[in-house]
Amino acid sequence: MLSALARPASAALRRSFSTSAQNNAKVAVLGASGGIGQPLSLLLKNSPLVSRLTLYDIAHTPGVAADLSHIETKAVVKGYLGPEQLPDCLKGCDVVVIPAGVPRKPGMTRDDLFNTNATIVATLAAACAQHRPEAMICIIANPVNSTIPITAEVFKKHGVYNPSKIFGVTTLDIVRANTFVAELKGLDPARVNVPVIGGHAGKTIIPLISQCTPKVDFPQDQLTALTGRIQEAGTEVVKAKAGAGSATLSMAYAGARFVFSLVDAMNGKEGVVECSFVKSQETECTYFSTPLLLGKKGIEKNLGIGQIPSFEEKMISDAIPELKASIKKGEDFVKTLK
């Protein structure tokens, strides 16, 4: 069933460049001057789905906004600088995307980013909860396994929590899985769809190759190697960039893909499915990524995990302790805030 619903990976991105799409979304990017924020803002500006694009950061946003505003697409772009301008940036937004935070450097795990990024995400989440609680919130800032629980707890503190509208963007894991499977099988990656469930770090990233469309088969040793490559693909990029950052361009692409899918669903398009790290009852973890049917109000239905072989079952049970610890770390962090 999942395979039937899940559309080819890049359909949303391709459609965003067509002229027939509905096109009134007001999108805010918080952290718009950074390595992910700039290319993400470019992709959003290039889409006819977006009518207004507001960019926030603590530096350089007027310049980024001025640069993007010269592009001959209809999205109106405005930059906002510093905390006092954040409420205006959020005003009337339908979708808020948060790539803000520091990137990984060689030798760092996503969890090493926790201390810096937890504070940044909590601060931005509080502003969203106060000034635009109705918006869809898409968190890119790592570690997503902790920053989503942080966002949820901050929204609870403000009495405006809606679990159907807070998304951890794990789309890059799906994009990578699609690409790597396509490479191995000589397929068009735009026609491959691999659900990736669990979390968004190391062994919590669980690609369900058994549910890939089209159906693919690998011998166990190749399957193990492929799974490992998907799980460590972020580290592959960090190493290749040799200290000059982490995955920014592919992450911007994946973030845009998720936003376009969400906006399509908000516009009433049916059958839009994306995986995302959200509040969940699918496993004993309180947050878990699975394929979600998206709708006008966010998550319409959690499609769950479905039938999987023992190899994938074991990956889930191996991931749960680490995932629980990351979730607890995020929740505990919010308890320390005033």
UniProtKB/Swiss-Prot annotation:
Keyword field: Acetylation, Glycoprotein, Mitochondrion, NAD, Oxidoreductase, Phosphoprotein, Transit peptide, Tricarboxylic acid cycle
**Record's superkingdom?**
Eukaryota
Residues that the record marks as modified (N6-malonyllysine) are: K239, K329
Modification after translation is described as: Acetylation is enhanced after treatment either with trichostin A (TCA) or with nicotinamide (NAM) with the appearance of tri- and tetraacetylations. Glucose also increases acetylation.
In this UniProt entry, the residues modified to N6-succinyllysine are: K78, K91, K185, K203, K215, K239, K269, K296, K301, K314, K324, K328, K335
Q: What EC class is this?
A: oxidoreductase
Could you tell me the EC number(s) of this protein?
1.1.1.37
Carbohydrate attachment sites?
Answer: S33
Q: Which Gene3D superfamilies match?
A: Lactate dehydrogenase/glycoside hydrolase, family 4, C-terminal, NAD(P)-binding Rossmann-like Domain
Residues with the Phosphoserine modification: S246, S326
N6-acetyllysine modification, residue list: K78, K91, K165, K185, K215, K239, K296, K301, K314, K324, K328, K329, K335
Which Pfam family, just one, is annotated for this protein? Ldh_1_N
Transit peptide as recorded in UniProt:
1-24
Description of activity control: Enzyme activity is enhanced by acetylation.
GO CC field = mitochondrial matrix
Subcellular location, principal: mitochondrion
Q: Name one GO molecular function term.
A: L-malate dehydrogenase (NAD+) activity
- Give the residues the record marks as binding NAD(+): G31, A32, S33, G34, G35, I36, G37, D57, N117, I140, A141, N142, M251
Give the location in the cell.
Mitochondrion matrix
| GO biological process: one example | tricarboxylic acid cycle
Q: Which reaction does it catalyse?
A: (S)-malate + NAD(+) = oxaloacetate + NADH + H(+)
Catalytic residues of the enzyme: H200 (proton acceptor)
Assembly and oligomerization: Homodimer.
The Swiss-Prot or TrEMBL record describes its family as follows: Belongs to the LDH/MDH superfamily. MDH type 1 family.
- Name listed for the protein in its UniProt record: Malate dehydrogenase, mitochondrial
Gene name of the encoded protein: MDH2
